[in-house]
């Protein structure tokens, strides 16, 4: 009867959902699960780092010093050229349509720090450092589709064709890496990067190869999405990994923290997906809807309200939030450039006593609701000054003698 009902609703071959219903009612269960996490890179990927650094194989100390000087000058020259190219790039602050996808930033989590609002409420923020981000390469959707299995899923999706933009972070010693890894940075004209991250970008928001990315790519008050690997806890038991209760504390011998029975009543096997002791953490996770409350321009540091996945020192991919009510409406396209910088002219006044001169402070951007520690915390009005002072409560009361 069920099969005839399904055939009356559908025409042609039986769809997948109908097959699941038939198997469920017939006593068979169709189990759906994802791919298992791996801790090592795929074997077909080329090596990134040299097994034996070239600087330690039969090279005298004088030659090493010469190579270090040449590498330092090449890195400085590449950074200078990239900065000059960024000044020539045409950028503007425009309204961003819902179909556009901008590039993101590869940041490093350096800790958590509390901030306070103007009302005195404490909010815990994550501090993220933008370390020398540059655009390494741009791959068209056609080339990405042909060359990668991931590109076959993401190059042409429901949002239209997507370009893969690779961003590098953190300048490093090129002698540590293989020739094949260094070639992509030579083509872009930038220093060798330690970390790489890829983003899906639409055609109207494509940056140029070798373009530097600044922390001001995001604005204060904007909502972002953070993706990273969770804290690596190593091999853990069922109580820590899955929150199981364990066995009774009394009348139990050496089984207090065991998970108990793992049988499936008749199958003579353990079902895939059974919660058991094993490796905990180090999984890719995404947290969306995080608000940026503060940006330190001089140190390239972003303060994000809330927590992000990963331990201190882990690499995080930061991009625009796509939630409907938290989507970016207006911003720099394709990214921020020095041509968008505006110098705010303030009247020259002598600093008040007890305040820090502005030339000694960092160039920072704050959310309007965030309290700045250079501002006074308590303001007294004339009405407060006219109030009668009360009794000194630190001293004992003394009865007045009647005359």
UniProtKB/Swiss-Prot annotation:
Compartments annotated for it: namely: Mitochondrion
Q: Which Gene3D superfamilies match?
A: Translation factors
Arranged from A to Z, the UniProt key words for this protein are: Mitochondrion, Ribonucleoprotein, Ribosomal protein
UniProt entry tagged with the keyword Ribosomal protein: yes
Q: Name one GO molecular function term.
A: structural constituent of ribosome
Is the keyword Iron assigned to this protein? no
Q: Name one GO biological process term.
A: translation
List, alphabetically, the InterPro entries matched. Ribosomal_uL3 (IPR000597), Ribosomal_uL3_bac/org-type (IPR019927), Transl_B-barrel_sf (IPR009000)
Region spans: Disordered: 32-56
CC annotations in GO = mitochondrial large ribosomal subunit
Q: Which PANTHER family match?
A: 50S RIBOSOMAL PROTEIN L3 (PTHR11229), LARGE RIBOSOMAL SUBUNIT PROTEIN UL3M (PTHR11229:SF8)
Give the family, as the similarity comment puts it.
Belongs to the universal ribosomal protein uL3 family.
What's this protein's name? Large ribosomal subunit protein uL3m
């Amino acid at each position: 009867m069920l099969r005839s009902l399904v055939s009356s609703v559908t025409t042609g071959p039986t769809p997948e959902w109908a097959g699941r219903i038939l198997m469920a009612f017939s006593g068979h269960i169709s189990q759906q699960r994802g791919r298992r996490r791996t801790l090592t890179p795929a074997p077909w990927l080329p090596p990134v780092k040299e097994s034996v650094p070239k600087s330690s194989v039969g090279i005298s100390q004088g030659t090493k010093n010469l190579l270090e000087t040449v590498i330092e000058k090449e890195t400085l020259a590449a950074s200078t050229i990239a900065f000059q190219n960024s000044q020539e790039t045409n950028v503007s602050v425009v309204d961003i349509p819902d179909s556009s996808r901008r590039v993101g930033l590869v940041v490093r989590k350096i800790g958590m720090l509390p901030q306070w609002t103007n009302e005195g409420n404490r909010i815990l923020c994550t501090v993220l450092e933008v370390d020398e981000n540059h655009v390494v390469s741009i791959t068209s959707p056609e080339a990405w589709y042909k060359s990668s299995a991931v590109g076959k899923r993401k190059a042409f999706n429901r949002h239209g064709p997507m370009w893969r933009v690779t961003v590098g972070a953190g300048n490093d010693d090129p002698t540590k890496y293989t020739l094949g890894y260094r070639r992509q940075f030579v083509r872009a004209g930038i220093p060798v990067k330690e970390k790489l991250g890829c983003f899906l970008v639409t055609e109207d928001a494509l940056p140029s190869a070798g373009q530097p990315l600044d922390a001001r790519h995001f604005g204060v008050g904007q909502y972002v999405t953070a993706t990273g690997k969770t804290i690596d806890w190593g091999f853990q038991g069922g109580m820590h990994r899955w929150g199981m209760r364990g066995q009774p504390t009394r009348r139990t011998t050496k089984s207090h923290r065991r998970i108990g029975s793992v049988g499936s009543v008749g199958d003579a096997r353990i079902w895939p997906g059974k919660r058991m002791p094993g490796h905990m953490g180090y999984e890719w996770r995404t947290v969306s809807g995080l608000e940026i409350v503060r940006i330190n321009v001089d140190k390239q540091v972003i303060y994000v309200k809330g927590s992000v996945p990963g331990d201190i020192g882990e690499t995080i991919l930061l991009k625009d939030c796509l939630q409907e009510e938290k989507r970016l409406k207006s911003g720099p396209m394709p990214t921020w450039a020095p041509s968008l910088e505006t110098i705010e002219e303030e009247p020259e006044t002598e600093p008040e006593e007890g305040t820090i001169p502005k030339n000694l402070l960092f160039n920072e951007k704050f959310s309007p609701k965030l309290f700045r520690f250079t501002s006074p915390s308590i303001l007294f009005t004339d009405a407060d000054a006219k109030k009668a002072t009360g009794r000194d409560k630190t001293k004992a009361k003394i009865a007045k003698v009647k005359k």
